[in-house]
């Protein structure tokens, strides 16, 4: 029997999560052969070379923390020649009882999704029909909506395909496209993080005026972050329970604010991971939250 997949919100207690260690293969971040999407993304985020062994060591710190907190950590098999394989958040999204396989925007990342079909994992990923959509752009702020950021990696067609697939599988949720006012956005989760019921970190400057109004109307407490904090990927936190959030070491102001909101804040050194724009949320793919 397949293991249950169920994720209702961003902040349910984390019980089962997939991760994948960084591989030794890396891609050039500068030069004439850099993809135009990456060139645009460099305007809104910081990209520097990283040491894969150091990334793996920092991932092991997070794995230990999650296991100590009662989560089962499933390690996905390697994806050869995939420099971003340690960001499994992008390859799928769990919405309620269904795991949807992402439609990745970059050709070189496509092999990353193969691990979802490993029979030992007990997963039954559902394919979407069109467009592009990556898990870093998909958020579950509550039990009735799915936010989908229209970043460089996710298209309106991808968001529409998710809405159609939800209906086919009996998931009664509204897909809400999230609009940015600038090009070059890597993913929504570098600029918005739902950390508790009705509470989110937000980098307001990248969203349209209408989008900010929508956030104001649908969240009880929006905590603004600075441009520097967003560039340092400090928004990309991981809620592991309704009152517990993991943040990257060095996110001092954010840590203080979250603690003042009554949250337990745990820290992990992720300084090597964040040398390209991904952090705690990016390196985890929740499969079961309660």
Segments (PLM) and residue ranges:
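The feature marks the mature, well-folded catalytic cores of soluble enzymes
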Residues: 1-290
């Amino acid at each position: 029997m397949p293991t249950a997949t169920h994720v209702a919100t961003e902040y349910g207690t984390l019980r089962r999560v997939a991760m994948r260690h960084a591989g030794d293969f890396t891609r050039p971040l500068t030069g004439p052969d850099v993809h135009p999407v990456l060139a645009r993304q460099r305007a809104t985020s910081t990209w520097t070379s990283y040491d894969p062994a150091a990334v793996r060591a920092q991932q092991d710190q997070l794995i230990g923390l999650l296991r100590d907190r009662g989560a089962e950590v499933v390690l996905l098999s390697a994806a050869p020649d995939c420099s971003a394989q340690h960001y499994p958040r992008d390859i799928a999204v769990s919405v309620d009882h269904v795991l949807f396989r992402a439609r990745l925007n970059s050709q070189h990342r496509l092999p990353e999704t193969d691990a979802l079909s490993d029979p030992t994992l007990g997963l039954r990923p559902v394919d979407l029909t069109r467009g592009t959509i990556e898990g870093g752009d998909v958020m579950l702020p509550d039990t009735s909506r799915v936010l989908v950021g229209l970043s460089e990696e996710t298209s309106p067609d991808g968001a529409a395909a998710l809405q159609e697939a939800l209906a086919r599988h009996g998931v009664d949720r509204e897909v809400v496209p999230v609009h940015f006012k600038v090009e070059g956005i890597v993913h929504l989760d570098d600029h918005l993080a739902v950390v508790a019921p009705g509470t989110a970190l937000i980098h307001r400057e990248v969203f349209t005026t209408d989008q900010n109004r929508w956030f104001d109307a649908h969240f009880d407490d929006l905590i603004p972050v600075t441009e520097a904090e967003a560039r340092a990927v400090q928004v990309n936190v991981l809620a592991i329970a309704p009152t517990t959030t993991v943040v990257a070491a060095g996110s001092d102001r954010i840590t203080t604010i979250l603690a003042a909101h009554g949250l337990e804040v745990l820290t992990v050194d992720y300084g090597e991971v964040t040398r390209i724009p991904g952090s705690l949320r990016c390196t985890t793919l929740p499969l079961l939250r309660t």
